[in-house]
Swiss-Prot record:
Protein's UniProt keywords contain Transmembrane: no
Compartments where located: Cytoplasm
Keyword Disulfide bond: no
SMART domains from the UniProt entry: AAA, PAS
SUPFAM superfamilies, A to Z: ACT-like (SSF55021), Homeodomain-like (SSF46689), P-loop containing nucleoside triphosphate hydrolases (SSF52540), PYP-like sensor domain (PAS domain) (SSF55785)
Quaternary structure and interacting proteins, as annotated: Homodimer. In presence of tyrosine (or high concentrations of phenylalanine or tryptophan) and ATP, it self-associates to form an hexamer.
Protein name: HTH-type transcriptional regulatory protein TyrR
Organism: Salmonella typhimurium (strain LT2 / SGSC1412 / ATCC 700720)
Signal peptide: none
Cellular-component GO terms for this entry: cytoplasm; protein-DNA complex
Annotated PANTHER family: HTH-TYPE TRANSCRIPTIONAL REGULATORY PROTEIN TYRR, TRANSCRIPTIONAL REGULATORY PROTEIN
Length: 513
């Protein structure tokens, strides 16, 4: 029988409660005291009349506000919850003490080693896992999880060993043991395969924290539902292909094929057969294969004038002929085009058909460069760090406090792709458990030079001025890393600079200014 006593924080109250149990000759099996004003009692079953009388007497104790029966003591509830969790885990889990002896093993581990719970407690980790040296791991003063490949009963496992630190009476955290989890590589492969075949809710894979990216994603969600051609523009590495695929996945065509062709990577004479098919070889083209779905034509600005004419005809009525065949084929395909070039300039230079441009420019999605979305940089960094650490089977490193300042100040001419590659390169060569600015190699970047690129003259005068102003501040802030120094350099007030830095998302934490 277990009771939960609600009470005030009064000196001597617990003593009076225990005296009452002694007076009634009740065998107390356990007592637990909660700091928030609850006392839990565990004792043998009582007759109903004795129990009712005891409850009444407890309520008469000064400071007791209520009393009720409960099914478990707090420690019992925690133990049962932990046991249920361990039993539900499909992966074998072991709890080890400081001598590598098994203290606890879940059912999956008992099944793997063909041992009962009791017999498991008579083994050390080294006896169960061939080649595992617990002492060597211990001598390394472990502070975080460690992964290594092990073979058990002919099966391959990724073993993750995590140190367990508990707080002692001096408020110091001391190492008390470890938890070992064994992940079957076959099971992991199946899970990844299943994950890759699922419809990962279209835009859930796109990081959008900044207002600009949120607006683009919201716009893309609306455009995804339409069937008219979609033109996606943006600098290199901004994620045009990712948005194209997301638009397909979010559209009514998601159950149908999605195919992508890079117009710049295929010779001109091969593009036609790739898109429309080749009759002599019995080959179906992209448009025919993707009937009912979507086709991405990446780097559309690189398409030859002859192919531009054929594409325009297809966009007008959805019909085409395979190479070497006169028979017309009609398909229903949504065409998504992507380019990092300024198509208006190409039209003016006679390199891109004006009528095709207007046919493609019905629905347009313009992706901003990463330098214009500084709020997205750290969320993207955290995503890439987690992804690549997991892929490489290494612990996820901590991000140093000053990493954010360095990454958000950099101009990222290669945009998200450059950030992704920089993080990957840093993790492959990282020593230690912290990712610092010096671990990420970034080429020199002149923000002012980029500011006069193809997109610099788009929009109103205010838009153009803002882009140039942000570029100047981005470049100079690296050399004058405080608002006061930068204000002095530019000959304006500290307040004006602070406001501008906040406006463009370039400001550091207050304590760093």
């Amino acid at each position: 029988m277990r009771l939960e006593v609600f009470c005030e924080d009064r000196l001597g109250l617990t003593r009076e409660l225990l005296d009452l149990l002694v007076l009634r000759s009740i065998d107390l099996r356990g007592i637990e005291i909660d700091p928030i004003g609850r006392i839990y009692l565990n004792f043998a079953e009582l007759e109903f009349t004795d129990f009712s009388s005891l409850m009444a007497e407890i309520r008469r104790i000064s400071g007791v506000t209520d009393v009720r029966t409960v099914p478990w003591m707090p420690s019992e509830r925690e133990h049962l919850a932990l046991s249920a969790l361990l039993e539900a885990l499909p992966e074998p889990v072991l709890s080890l003490d400081m001598k590598s002896k098994v203290e606890m093993a879940n059912p999956a581990s008992c099944q793997l080693f063909a041992q009962s719970q009791e017999r498991m407690r008579h083994h050390t980790a080294a006896q169960l896992i061939n080649g595992f040296n617990f002492q060597r791991w211990l001598d390394g003063n472990p502070q975080s999880s460690h992964n290594e490949h092990v073979v058990i009963n002919g099966q391959n496992f990724l073993m993750e060993i995590t140190p367990v630190h508990l707080q002692n009476e001096n408020d110091e955290y001391v190492l008390t043991g470890a938890v070992v989890m064994l992940r079957s590589t076959i099971r992991m492969g199946q899970q990844l395969q299943n994950l890759s075949t699922q419809d990962l809710s279209a835009f859930s894979q796109i990081i959008a924290v900044s207002a600009k990216m949120k607006h683009v994603v919201e716009q893309a969600r609306k455009l995804a539902m339409l069937s008219a051609p979609l033109l996606i523009t943006g600098d290199t590495g901004t994620g045009k292909d990712l948005f194209a695929y997301a638009c397909h996945q979010a559209s009514p065509r998601s159950a149908k094929p999605y195919l992508a062709l890079n117009c710049a990577s295929i010779p001109e004479d091969a593009v036609e057969s790739e898109l429309f098919g080749h009759a002599p070889e019995g080959k179906k083209g992209f448009f025919e294969q993707a009937n009912g779905g979507s086709v991405l034509l990446d780097e559309i600005g690189e398409m030859s004038p002859r192919m531009q004419a054929k594409l325009l005809r297809f966009l007008n009525d959805g019909t085409f002929r395979r190479v070497g065949e006169d028979h017309e084929i009609h398909v229903d395909v949504r065409v998504i085009c992507a380019t990092q070039k300024n198509l208006v300039e190409l039209v003016q230079k006679g390199l891109f058909r004006e009528d095709l441009y207007y046919r493609l420019n019905v629905l347009t999605l313009n992706l901003p460069p990463l330098r214009d979305c500084p709020q997205d940089i750290m969320p993207l960094t955290e995503l890439f760090v987690a992804r690549f650490a997991d892929e490489q089977g290494v612990p996820r490193p901590k991000l140093s406090a000053d990493l954010s300042t360095v990454l958000t100040r950099y101009g990222w001419p290669g945009n998200v792709r450059q950030l992704k590659n920089a993080i990957y390169r840093a993790l492959t060569q990282l020593e230690g458990y912290e990712l610092r600015p010096q671990d990420i190699l970034l080429p020199d970047y002149d923000a002012a030079t980029v500011a006069v690129g193809e997109d610099a003259m788009e929009g109103s005068l205010d838009d153009i001025t803002s882009r140039f102003e942000r570029s100047v501040l981005t470049q100079l802030y690296r050399s004058y890393p405080s608002t006061r120094k930068l204000a002095k350099r530019l000959g304006v007030s500290h307040t004006a600079i602070a406001n501008k830095l906040r406006e463009y998302g370039l400001s550091q934490k207050k304590g760093e200014e």
